[in-house]
């Protein structure tokens, strides 16, 4: 294959470097998998006694004095090792602790989080079995920096109000533990969630504090100081992929300044990608890696376009030059958003239609927020500067409050966030990409814009027509008792079970999928507690008659059954019936349904053909003989076209043992 590729390359010189790069990348992936990953995965299925170190991503588990997160196994059954594993619950208080214990090693579950964990060097998961024995805490430098970061986080919490301290901690220290769900959702909906993830923008702004203008740009001691500051910040934040990429690019640029060489963003970015891929061949599977590099490509394209426009406007009036300057930030935001769109769609994430506007409004506010945050940390460390500390905290709070207000205003705009159909959108983007290659090869790129615009209009029109009346049903929330959300034509019906956390998960899911608040919330709980549902209509089944029926959405029917403390809702979509229940229902005649969603128990009064569930080991599993079982760990569901097809999403068939 390599020989054929080389022969083909000789005839196509322009494609030599990309093809050779792809072949080298594939070869390195195979070598990395065989040499490093395969021996680790061979440990799966064993029960071992290990010495483990708690890594810095560990956070509180559901039980008291328990953590969950990544463990680094430094010794396995008396043999030295260096294996990172995922553990859902283990004894501990903070990162850096060491202990010995017995673990059961298993492979990572085959779900959408698998590649993300592998990109962080985690190839196994473990279950804690006991025999806990604490050891002396690790003295590795990364834990000293982690403790320093925690002290600075405590300082921000002490001086800034709730919500605002979480925003500053995320932007300055890459810590999202204090971010409210509502704040994260607002930034995500407005298309500026990248501001809450430390990246090249933040690193460049912070290191720019040591720039002192163009006069001192090539002053070598100052270059070394900027490089040291960048390296310290990399280590302080724990070196996530986006920060590592930005740090490598910045260090390469500083090396260029040191030797008086011109910078090249595209080459530096490629070099960073190669380094990250060499240390872990799965690194490109990380979402942050993909978004970061795609955004850089968009920024690079915008810079090239801006230079072309400036050259064309050299002999034009001052108004044309001013127009180019005004258009540059708009083009940068638009092309960066467009470059990251395929990644967002591939990961089934919502895209923002107000991202360009919101970026223009708030990105300039990030640098003052970072500068004020640093000033607050410095002043708070000096007792006699308490007055300056109070003033800095006040100014920073007002600044962050203004930033958050702008973000929420943008997020509240109509169609701020939309969820595009994954496969169809990726196909349309692939067609547009193929057209771009064809026009570039034919040297007719100027004709590409009208052709792409026409194809986009046709794709959007066809997509809207194809999605009309399609019903999407998903399980959202706690795995043992999830809610069921039905979306059709931008309207939603929520079958509610559980508590506040389930409702929060439903709201996050509906962002971008529904144009307004849910049209109907059906409360299936046996003992409904007081909760504030934001919905056009709320129906509590416990307060209804034994049986009621009504139309919902566009041409769907809803049958509601009530018996003592058990409730059942059956949604009719054409000839198919989807059931959601709470409690063990007893009816005179059984109800036959096509799909039963995540039951807590099985009742003889409900006879499903298929059961869709999210719990790993439900109690009713042994009683499900004769039913097809469909399991999905994260938001499984199905898509129905009334009177036509039913397609399962993120749900695999499970064989009954």
What are these regions (language model features)?
Residues 192-217, 518-535, 594-606, 614-620:
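Di-metal (Zn2+ and/or Mg2+/Mn2+) metal-binding site signature of metallo-dependent hydrolases
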Residues 49-89, 94-113, 476-533, 567-568, ...:
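Short periplasmic/luminal acceptor-recognition loop of GT-C membrane glycosyltransferases, typified by
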């Amino acid at each position: 294959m390599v020989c054929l590729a080389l022969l083909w390359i000789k005839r196509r010189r322009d494609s030599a470097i990309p093809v050779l790069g792809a072949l080298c990348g594939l070869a390195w992936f195979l070598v990395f998998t065989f040499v490093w990953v395969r021996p680790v995965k061979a440990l799966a299925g064993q029960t071992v006694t290990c010495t483990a170190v708690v890594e810095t991503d560990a956070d509180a588990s559901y039980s008291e004095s328990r953590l969950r997160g990544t463990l680094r196994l430094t010794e396995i059954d008396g043999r030295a090792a260096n294996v990172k594993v995922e553990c859902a619950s283990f004894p501990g208080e903070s990162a850096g602790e060491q202990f010995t214990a017995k673990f059961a090693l298993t492979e990572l579950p085959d779900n959408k989080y698998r590649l993300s964990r592998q990109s962080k060097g985690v190839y196994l998961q473990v279950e804690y079995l006991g025999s806990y024995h604490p050891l002396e805490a690790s003295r590795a430098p990364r834990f000293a920096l982690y403790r320093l970061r925690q002290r600075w986080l405590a300082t921000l919490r002490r001086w800034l109000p709730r919500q605002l301290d979480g925003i500053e901690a995320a932007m300055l220290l890459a810590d999202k533990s204090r971010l409210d769900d509502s704040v994260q959702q607002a930034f995500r909906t407005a298309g500026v969630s990248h501001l809450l993830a430390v990246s090249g923008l933040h690193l460049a702004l912070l290191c720019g504090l040591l720039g002192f203008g163009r006069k001192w740009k090539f002053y070598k001691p100052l270059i070394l100081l900027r490089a040291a500051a960048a390296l310290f910040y990399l280590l302080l934040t724990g070196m996530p992929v986006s920060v590592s990429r930005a740090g490598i690019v910045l260090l390469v640029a500083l090396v260029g300044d040191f030797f008086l060489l011109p910078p090249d963003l595209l080459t530096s970015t490629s070099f960073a990608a190669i380094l990250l891929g060499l240390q872990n061949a799965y690194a490109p599977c990380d979402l942050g890696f993909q978004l970061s590099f795609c955004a850089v490509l968009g920024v690079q394209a915008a810079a090239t376009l801006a230079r072309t426009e400036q050259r064309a406007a050299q002999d034009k009036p001052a108004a044309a030059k001013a127009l180019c300057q005004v258009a540059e930030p708009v083009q940068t935001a638009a092309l960066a958003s467009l470059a990251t769109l395929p990644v967002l769609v591939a990961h089934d994430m919502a895209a923002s239609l107000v991202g360009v506007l919101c970026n223009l409004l708030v990105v300039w506010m990030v640098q003052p927020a970072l500068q004020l945050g640093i000033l607050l940390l410095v002043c708070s460390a000096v007792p006699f500067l308490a007055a300056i500390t109070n003033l800095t905290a006040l100014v920073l709070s007002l600044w962050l409050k203004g930033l958050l207000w702008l973000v929420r205003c943008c997020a509240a705009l109509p169609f701020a966030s939309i969820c595009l159909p994954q496969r169809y959108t990726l196909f349309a983007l692939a067609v547009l990409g193929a057209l771009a290659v064809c026009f570039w090869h034919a040297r007719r790129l100027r004709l590409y814009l009208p052709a792409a615009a026409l194809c986009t209009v046709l794709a959007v029109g066809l997509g809207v027509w194809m999605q009309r009346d399609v019903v999407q049903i998903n399980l959202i929330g706690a795995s043992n008792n999830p809610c069921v959300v039905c979306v059709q034509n931008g309207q939603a019906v929520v079958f509610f079970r559980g508590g506040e956390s389930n409702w929060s998960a439903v709201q996050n899911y509906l962002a971008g999928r529904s144009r307004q608040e849910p049209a109907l919330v059906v409360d299936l709980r046996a003992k409904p507690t007081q909760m504030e549902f934001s919905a056009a209509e709320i129906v509590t089944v416990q307060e209804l008659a034994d049986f009621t029926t009504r139309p919902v959405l566009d041409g769907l029917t809803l049958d509601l059954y009530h018996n003592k403390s058990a409730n059942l809702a059956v949604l009719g979509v054409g000839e198919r019936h989807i059931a959601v229940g709470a409690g063990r229902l007893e009816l005179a005649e059984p109800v036959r349904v096509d799909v039963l969603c995540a039951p807590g128990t099985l009742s003889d009064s409900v006879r499903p053909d298929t059961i869709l569930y999210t719990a790993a080991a439900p109690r009713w599993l042994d009683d499900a003989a004769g039913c097809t079982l469909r399991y999905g760990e994260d938001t499984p569901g199905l898509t129905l076209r009334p009177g036509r097809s039913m397609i399962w999403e993120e749900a695999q068939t499970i064989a009954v043992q």
